[in-house]
UniProtKB/Swiss-Prot annotation:
Catalytic activity field: apo-[ACP] + CoA = holo-[ACP] + adenosine 3',5'-bisphosphate + H(+)
GO cellular component annotations of the record: cytoplasm
Annotated Mg(2+) binding sites: D7, E55
Entry annotated with the keyword Heme: no
Lineage: Bacteria, Pseudomonadati, Spirochaetota, Spirochaetia, Spirochaetales
Compartment(s): Cytoplasm
Primary localisation category: cytoplasm
An individual GO BP term: fatty acid biosynthetic process
Protein name, as recorded: Holo-[acyl-carrier-protein] synthase
E.C. designation(s): 2.7.8.7
Gene: acpS
């Protein structure tokens, strides 16, 4: 194991995202936003969980960085694998870094009414 990252977030913080499209587009890709629309009643929990996942990955990668890289949270996309579990799809400089370092990323997300939490493990 190389590194870990964890983030917990109050789900309530993301209610404003539903009313503010620009705010949502600042942190989430178009693909993620489309997937949220399919969620139905659990959109806010899903938003919070995916945001926590992105923050967890940053926390896990930061100790491994040997140089500064430019990224936005939109460069970290949280998608579903064929098995149905959440996984990362990275873009731009953060993707290049992960490839260069030969990193394997493991992600778990959980949410329960008030809170969402994500845990990331990084290995190579």
């Amino acid at each position: 194991m190389k590194s870990i990252g964890c983030d917990i977030i109050k789900v309530e913080r993301f209610k404003s995202f539903l009313e503010n499209k620009k705010k949502m587009e600042r942190f989430f890709t178009h693909k993620e936003i489309e997937n949220f629309k399919l969620k139905g009643g659990s959109i806010i929990e899903s938003l919070a969980g995916k945001f926590a996942a992105k923050e967890s990955l940053i926390k896990a990668l930061t100790p491994l960085l040997q140089y500064k890289i430019r990224y936005s949270l939109k460069d970290i996309e949280v998608i579903k694998s064929l098995k149905g579990n959440a996984k990362f799809c990275l873009h731009n400089e953060i993707e290049k870094f992960a490839i260069k370092m030969n990193l394997k990323l493991y992600l778990t997300i959980s949410h329960e009414k008030e809170y969402a939490i994500a845990f990331v493990m990084v290995e190579n």
